[in-house]
Amino acid sequence: MKPEEIRKLEGYLKRTLNPVIEIKARPQKDDSAEVYLGEEFIGVIYRDDEDGELSYNFSMAILEIDL
């Protein structure tokens, strides 16, 4: 993902979910970025540009031990 795109997504997630969320580019991947809550990795956000419509999908695994 481009830096401007990451900046916009990070701003949205900070306003919507938590102000300490950070999004970091993934090496050699241009369709996704890593999402962190503080220093803890919490998931991946994917860019979906299908049929001319751009959307994003956030994927987060929740371990049973964390419940």
Label for each model-derived stretch:
Residues 1-67:
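Terminal leader/tail segments of proteins
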